[in-house]
Each structure stands twice: as structure tokens, then as C-alpha cells.
């Protein structure tokens, strides 16, 4: 045990007992009344267990990302409408994630602090994943309401519930790392989370082409989602609940007293601050919250366009079709899963190199520039295998986006309001997607109507994000 500036007699006996038991390092601040415990380093497997459930959640998210445009195009959506369907996921995230952060900051029960939300979100996500791909198979009226048929309306409401539940299940993993990992290990912990995220993406993206390969039908009657996609969602739902249950059982969260001592929080002052509202939190947010948020705006706008238009882009440039009912379009849909899996591999490999950079900022810039080159190159490539290079480069940007923003932000925060700040920070993920989705149809017309042109737009947005990184400072403000 290491003592800075004082003897053990300075500290309360209960504090010393916990310190001895848990092998904390005690750091004395300006006076003997203010102290902080930095918890001993976690083992690799403890950090792995913290994030393992994220693997299953990310499979669900990957299935949603790779197949939503395909599903709604199959149900009859016009290409210029596709970006509007993508407003729903980030909109729900912007509403749900700050609430989960706020509520879980105030939740202390036998099951834990963040874990109850994780479990509820996973259960709801599993149920919705069983229904969403069946939207076209159920007997709905073909009568249009606001230009959408019954199947599309069912799909829309299913998408709302799916994304809400995924957000509820996803957010606690980020918070638990912030809660339970010391500053020295947070970069490693978020890198493990990034690895599991990309591994889950890899599996989820490949599911449709795998099920097609083993003989499950990849085509279906007009307006019906193919069985290969349905089975992808079914198996993804099973893996999701198993992975979340693993983390739920393996991880034990801190109790309120231990958490306060770990983060150096004065419980009395925290009680006085409990009524602090969102505006007050934003007013006292560290500078990194805003500067990294600006980078996030450009990055997530770019990836929203990738998720929305990749299917239509390669169906046109590689398979030469824009007919959503055609075999070529469905083959392109499967290949999108392969390309996104390649992106996940690129992310996993690049994540190993990110710690080698001298600073987070330089890693951030290089990663986003490589991703921009990958996006722009899609416009010029007409061979399905050559696109592997493009998506490996895109994977570099994705690796940085998953790990670096949260590392920089959580290192700038104290333990107080950790969940609320992370929930609010996720608005920097959701808001740009809403804006990009809302204007996507207009931008598509401005660039000539070819969906592949939106990949160039995505590349330009990433270059803007790389430029914005230079405003980021890594310190507690």
C-alpha cells in the first residue's frame, strides 16, 4: 500500500480496512480530509468479463445495421425514403441513453447498478429480433398510410423497439468500464470492448451469407424477407441473451460506499448535487466532451450513410441492378454482410496498432484519414473482392471511433455523474445520425441520385472529422 503525504492514522478505519482488503493505492490530495482510492489493476479476464456481453449485443446491432435497408427495400421502400427509416435508431438512442445513464446512476439494488438495465434491454431485444424479419410474412393490409404499407409500419415499430432495447443493453457496458476500471487501464479495457464489438459485428454481418451457403433460401416472394435473413436474426437473438447472461453472472458491481471511495467522491456533497439537471451538467462538462463531440458529429454522419447506401451502391456498381426483388440485389445484400465483416476484421487489426501511437490524437487523425480513403475508393471500384481493401481501411476509422472517444472522455471525468455524462455523450453519436438521415434524400439528389455517390460524401465527412481532432485536448478541464 502506498501513502502520499500522510500516515494511515489520517484516514477513517473503515477506509483503511477496505484499502487493505482490496489492495487499493491511497492518494492524498491537498488536505487530509480529501482522499481517493485507485483500485488495483484488474486482470485481463476481469476486463474481458465486463464487456463479454457486448459481443452478443453487437451481433444484434450488426444484423440491424447490415439488413435494415435491405429489409425495408424488400418491403417496398423507395431508395429516397431509406434514410428516413434510419432516423429512428439514433432518435431512440438520443432519448434512451441519457435516461439510462441518469436512472442507473441512482440505482443500487441486489442485482447491481447497471446490470438490471443490461438484462431488461437484452430480453426485449431478443423478443423483437424474432418478429422484425417476419414483417413481410404477416397478413397486413396493403392500404397505404403516409405512403407506407402495413408491413412497413410493422417493421418501423419493430425497429423502434429493437433499437431502444439495444441501446438499453449496450449503454451499461460502457458505464461499467468507467465505474470499475482505473485510469491507467481504461484504454486497455475499452480496447477489449472494441475487440469484442468488432468480433460480434464480424459474426453478425456474416450470418446471412453463411445461412445461404448451407442451403437456406436467400430469395423470397415479393415483399417477404428471405429465410437466410430470418435465421440470422433468430440465432443472433440466442447468442445475445447467452452472452449478456454470462456478464450478468460473472460481474459484481461496487456498492455505493465502495464506489464513492474508489472515485474519491464525498457522499454528502453528492447527495446535495442529486437534483442537478441536464443543463447544469452540460454547463460543467469538461472541454473534451464538446471537442470530441464535434469529431463524433462528422464520423457518425459518415457511417450512417454507409449503413444506408452500401447495399444499393454495390448492387448497382458490381451487380448492375437497382431492383430490390432481383437475385442480384439480394446477392449484393449478402455481400454487404461480407464487406462489413471485412471492416470488422480491419477494426480488430487496427485496434492492436492504436496503442503504438504516441498520442490518442495522432491515432485518431490517422485512423479517420484512412477511413475516408476507404469510403471514397468505393466509388471507383467495380469488383466485389477489390472492395475488401476499401472496407479494411474503413475499419481503421471504426476502431478509433469505438475506443478513443470514450477513453478521452472518461479520463476527463470524475466518478460523479459518470452514467449521466456517458448517456449525454451518446447524443453526439445519435444527433449526427438524425441530421444525416433527415437530409439524406436531399443530399442524394444533389450528388446526382446514384447511391454510390453517398460513399464519397461519407469520405469527405470523415476528413472533416480528422481536422476536428486537432481541437481535442487530453486533460481534465
Where are these regions (language model features)?
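Loop-to-transmembrane helix entry/capping segments in MFS-fold secondary transporters
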Residues: 79-80, 183-193, 415-425
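A late C-terminal transmembrane helix in Major Facilitator Superfamily
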Residues: 418-446
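C-terminal transmembrane helical hairpin of 12-TM major facilitator-type secondary transporters
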Residues: 361-403
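Intracellular loop-helix junctions on the cytosolic face of multi-pass helical membrane proteins
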Residues: 4, 10, 14-43, 141-142, ...
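C-terminal ends and interior cores of transmembrane alpha-helices
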Residues: 119-148, 370-382
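Helix-loop boundary and gating motifs at the non-cytosolic
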Residues: 38-92, 291, 295, 299-323
Amino acid at each position: 500500500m502506498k501513502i502520499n503525504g500522510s500516515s494511515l492514522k489520517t484516514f477513517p478505519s473503515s477506509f483503511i480496512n477496505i484499502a487493505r482488503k482490496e489492495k487499493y493505492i491511497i492518494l492524498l490530495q491537498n488536505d487530509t480530509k480529501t482522499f481517493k482510492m485507485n483500485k488495483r489493476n484488474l486482470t485481463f479476464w476481469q476486463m474481458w468479463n465486463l464487456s463479454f456481453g457486448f459481443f452478443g449485443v453487437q451481433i444484434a446491432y450488426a444484423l440491424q445495421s447490415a439488413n435494415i435497408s435491405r429489409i425495408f427495400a424488400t418491403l417496398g421502400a423507395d431508395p429516397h425514403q431509406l434514410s428516413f427509416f434510419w432516423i429512428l435508431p439514433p432518435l431512440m438512442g438520443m432519448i434512451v441513453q441519457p435516461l439510462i445513464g441518469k436512472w442507473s446512476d441512482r440505482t443500487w439494488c441486489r442485482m447491481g447498478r447497471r446490470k438490471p438495465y443490461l438484462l431488461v434491454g437484452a430480453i426485449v431485444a431478443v423478443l423483437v429480433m424474432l418478429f422484425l424479419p417476419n414483417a413481410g410474412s404477416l397478413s397486413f393490409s396493403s392500404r397505404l398510410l403516409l405512403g407506407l404499407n402495413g408491413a412497413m409500419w410493422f417493421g418501423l415499430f419493430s425497429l423502434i423497439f429493437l433499437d431502444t432495447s439495444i441501446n438499453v443493453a449496450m449503454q451499461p457496458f460502457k458505464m461499467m468500464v468507467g465505474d470499475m476500471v482505473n485510469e491507467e487501464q481504461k484504454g486497455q479495457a475499452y480496447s477489449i470492448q472494441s475487440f469484442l464489438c468488432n468480433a460480434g459485428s464480424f459474426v453478425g454481418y456474416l450470418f446471412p451469407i453463411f445461412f445461404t451457403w448451407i442451403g437456406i433460401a436467400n430469395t423470397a416472394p415479393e415483399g417477404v424477407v428471405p429465410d437466410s435473413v430470418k435465421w440470422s436474426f433468430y440465432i443472433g437473438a440466442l447468442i445475445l441473451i447467452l452472452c449478456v447472461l454470462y456478464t450478468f453472472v460473472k460481474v459484481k458491481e461496487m456498492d455505493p460506499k465502495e464506489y464513492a471511495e474508489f472515485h474519491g467522491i464525498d457522499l454528502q456533497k453528492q447527495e446535495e448535487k442529486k437534483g442537478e439537471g441536464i443543463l447544469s451538467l452540460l454547463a460543467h462538462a469538461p472541454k473534451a466532451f464538446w471537442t470530441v463531440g464535434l469529431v463524433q458529429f462528422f464520423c457518425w454522419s459518415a457511417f450512417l450513410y454507409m449503413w444506408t447506401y452500401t447495399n444499393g451502391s454495390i448492387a448497382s456498381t458490381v451487380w448492375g441492378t437497382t431492383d430490390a426483388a432481383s437475385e442480384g440485389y439480394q446477392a449484393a445484400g449478402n455481400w454487404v454482410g461480407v464487406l462489413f465483416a471485412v471492416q470488422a476484421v480491419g477494426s480488430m487489426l487496427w485496434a492492436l496498432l492504436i496503442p503504438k501511437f504516441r498520442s490518442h490524437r495522432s491515432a485518431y487523425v490517422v485512423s479517420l484519414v484512412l477511413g475516408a480513403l476507404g469510403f471514397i475508393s468505393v466509388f471507383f471500384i467495380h469488383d466485389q473482392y477489390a472492395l475488401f481493401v476499401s472496407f479494411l481501411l474503413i475499419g481503421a476509422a471504426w476502431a478509433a471511433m469505438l475506443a478513443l472517444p470514450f477513453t478521452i472522455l472518461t479520463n476527463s471525468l470524475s466518478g460523479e455523474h459518470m452514467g449521466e455524462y456517458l448517456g449525454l455523450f451518446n447524443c453526439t453519436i445519435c444527433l449526427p445520425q438524425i441530421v444525416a438521415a433527415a437530409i439524406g434524400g436531399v443530399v442524394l439528389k444533389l450528388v446526382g441520385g446514384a447511391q454510390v455517390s453517398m460513399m464519397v460524401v461519407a469520405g469527405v465527412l470523415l476528413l472533416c472529422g480528422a481536422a476536428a481532432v486537432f481541437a481535442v485536448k487530453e486533460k481534465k478541464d
